[in-house]
């Protein structure tokens, strides 16, 4: 991937932009504006954007759990769906959380995705004020 800006083209649930046409339009505008890649959520969006842009697509699937926590591509199942949709890269969660996967589990998930897909993997990590997790 070239050096430059990567634009995340996503819309929250309930947003009037949360539809394939809007996500494709956002990605095309990001490319027109000079983005070197776009970050796209959801298999249908990934597939549609891949057909319309000539820059790399970083694919992810957000899974919201009953705890309210959101995980980015939390398992090989989602990673395989992203790969099949044509993403150039897979973004996967490696964030440690007390109530879910540990950092070690996150890294294992990343390794598994790397080994079982043919697409480069980008680790998504975020930490709040309660770091370090024990």
Name what the model sees in each region.
Residues 1-134:
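Alpha/beta enzyme core
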